[in-house]
Amino acid sequence: MSSGGLLLLLGLLTLWEELTPVSSKDRPDFCELPADTGPCRVGFPSFYYNPDEKKCLEFIYGGCQGNANNFITKEECESTCAA
């Protein structure tokens, strides 16, 4: 294969990798955790990734403890966990 062909192939593979959404193998493990309001009762609207529905959903976070599957915005949740 010529060097031009190899460069084209490399470019196409790089583009494909960049455009491929987050897959479950690349998703952080904490994205699989259930929503956890924690023991406090302040009541912050937050988002968590639901692996069964494959999307980010809103829940009420109590303000302390909980787990890492807890995002301030839906966009942050989607960019971290959504496929």
Curated annotation (Swiss-Prot):
Disulfide bonds join C31-C81, C40-C64, C56-C77. GO terms for molecular function: serine-type endopeptidase inhibitor activity; toxin activity. One of its GO terms (cellular component) is extracellular space. Residues 31-81 form the BPTI/Kunitz inhibitor domain. Belongs to the venom Kunitz-type family. Serine protease inhibitor. This is Kunitz-type serine protease inhibitor mulgin-3. It comes from Pseudechis australis (Mulga snake).
